[in-house]
Amino acid sequence: MKRAAMRLWTLNKGLLTHGRGLSQGSQYKISEPLHIHQVQVKLREIVGISTVWRDHVQAMEERKLLHSFLPKSQKVLPPRKIRDSYIEVLLPLGTDPELRDKYVTVQNTVRFGRILEDLDSLGVLVCYMHNHNHSTNMSLLSIVTVLVDKIDMCKHSLSPEQDIKFTGHVSWVGNTTMEVKMKMFQLHDDETYWPVLDATFVMVAQDSENKRPAFVNPLIPENKEEEELFTQGELNKSRRIAFSTSSLLKVAPSSEERNIIHELFLSTLDPKTISFQSRILPPKAVWMEDTKLKSLDICHPQERNVFNRIFGGFLMRKAYELAWATACSFGGSRPYVVTVDDIMFQKPVEVGSLLFLSSQVCFTQGNYIQVRVHSEVFSLDSREHMTTNVFHFTFMSEKEVPLIFPKTYGESMLYLDGQRHFKSMSTPVTLKKDYPVEP
């Protein structure tokens, strides 16, 4: 067993080229971006996992042997710079028709669910580059997405006829967690890249058995811009803690929120009767319970990640597509995603599980639709249902949408939670204007 561990530890060098051609400044450059297909290839090389499902048990057993090589303290790990993790990835939709078919919608736009999958893979690769050990190719760490903090869209829709470029880098590091900033750009006719999306993910490093947290390399900012990014990462952490502490699952609504719920309740009472039991809908309104949509997926090995659990990007894609269908059927027109936020990956989804998704509109305002998707799995072995994720999506409809009214106290809490997420939007009125950027 020890010999097998040493064999894994001393695999050939050079699989991961590290930040070639990076230059000083706030915009880092590399000589050539990775093709989108290379992201998964490199991840499997770094982790040392076979592409064949029947080999997964042996591969994971071999990875467990790396546990003894993990550092006992972060102090022994060399610090990294932002440039060390910076990466560019090309999605050549304009020049690859077969790839384009995978991403195109029937409305001739780009499938946002596929973009979520790419962002998840890119975020993991960025973190592996930050923690790259030059003495070996195979990483001792198992890095997974723990939180999608925020994804802000800058455009209504994307063209499937033009190339897309992703950039990403680590922006903040704790002891075992890392914040990753990613941007997405699309090529225009003038040969410049225009911004499309800003994303912030939080990743966690675990040991080779995916059981315990593992230390990651510290991050040292090189200039003022990087110091501001690092400070923002600290603020983001504090904001997440405050948001979690004030969760409606832990504390009662504020006095203002209680008044909102009471006003909603009063507006649904039937004026013809003097009763709290007789409820009617106001004009241009819909009961929250009537907006639900559900789906079921069997988690096949094809959708596994490099650690042989279900790929987080797949879960996000399925949740987004159900949320989009919910917003579309509710609003009566094609919705556009504006913001994705606060997606916490609470439990991993094992291959073979049954994945249940439940989506409903929980808040509306003007043309905006706030959709919540609850994800749970049913294990065929343990016969238990477990919540794995809660997803929050903000859509904008082409026309004004009906108001949402809760009936029960539980639905009222969903309404307030949806309102909180809506208010946290970075661009609550209109999408940002286009402007060219050279990524």
From Swiss-Prot:
Enzyme class: hydrolase
Entry-linked PROSITE patterns: HOTDOG_ACOT
Entry GO terms, CC: mitochondrion
One of the GO BP terms on file: acyl-CoA metabolic process
Tagged with keyword Repeat: yes
Keyword field: Hydrolase, Mitochondrion, Repeat, Serine esterase, Transit peptide
UniProt-listed Enzyme Commission number(s): 3.1.2.-
InterPro entries named among the record's database cross-references: HOTDOG_ACOT (IPR033120), HotDog_dom_sf (IPR029069)
Main location class: mitochondrion
Localisation per UniProt entry: Mitochondrion
GO MF term list: carboxylic ester hydrolase activity; fatty acyl-CoA hydrolase activity
Tagged with keyword Transcription regulation: no
Residues annotated as domain HotDog ACOT-type: 85-209, 289-401
Transit peptide endpoints, chain numbering: 1-21
Function: Catalyzes the hydrolysis of acyl-CoAs into free fatty acids and coenzyme A (CoASH), regulating their respective intracellular levels. Active on long chain acyl-CoAs.
Family matches, as PANTHER family: ACYL-COA THIOESTERASE, ACYL-COENZYME A THIOESTERASE 9, MITOCHONDRIAL
Family: Belongs to the acyl coenzyme A hydrolase family.
Name recorded for this polypeptide: Acyl-coenzyme A thioesterase 10, mitochondrial
Annotated organism of origin: Mus musculus (Mouse)
